[in-house]
Amino acid sequence: LHTVKENYIFEHDELNKIDYKNKKVIMITAHRRENWGEGIENICTALNKIVEENEDVELVYLVHLNPIVKDVVFEKLGGNPRIHLLPPQDTQETHNLMNKSFMVMTDSGGLQEEAPHLGKPVLVLRDVTERPEAVEYGTVKLVGTDVEKIVCEANNLINNEEAYEAMSKAVNPYGDGKASERIADAILRYFDLSDKEVDEFDR
């Protein structure tokens, strides 16, 4: 991702104060209509448990502005110094936060594609996904909104290095970021302007 920078300084200063090197920071987004009500409540309950059970974990929840989501999240998670509740961030802030994070928990479709590019395991807070290839290749895992399942899968990634490595180093089904180079090579070869073989993406 071209938006990611190694020494990125966030515009939102609270993000600059987080100890990414010594803490396992989990980035969270959850706002889909299907999760309104009991789903969001369960997610929040699970997040509280994850923080309680893991002293080296901090959460950054980018909270949707819809009161149906925001009110529940702030009521259940507000006031915990290791849970940072922030408004949605722009693309560059979000990508760099994701890059500095340990893992991602989300019900967003886009993040299921973006996080694997950065080697970040994704727990999907839904029972189904439009990205079944990500599940197949092991870059994401469906956990739904069941409290115990969310906590169990999160704790496994937090405390089991082998499980974390398996997801973070899984083959990314969405490519390697070199599609435009391959297209250019293919066009040049088609018009006999180059004899370079096109490097195909191999999953």
What do these predicted regions represent?
Residues 1-61, 66-203:
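Nucleotide-activated sugar donor-binding and catalytic core shared by glycosyltransferases
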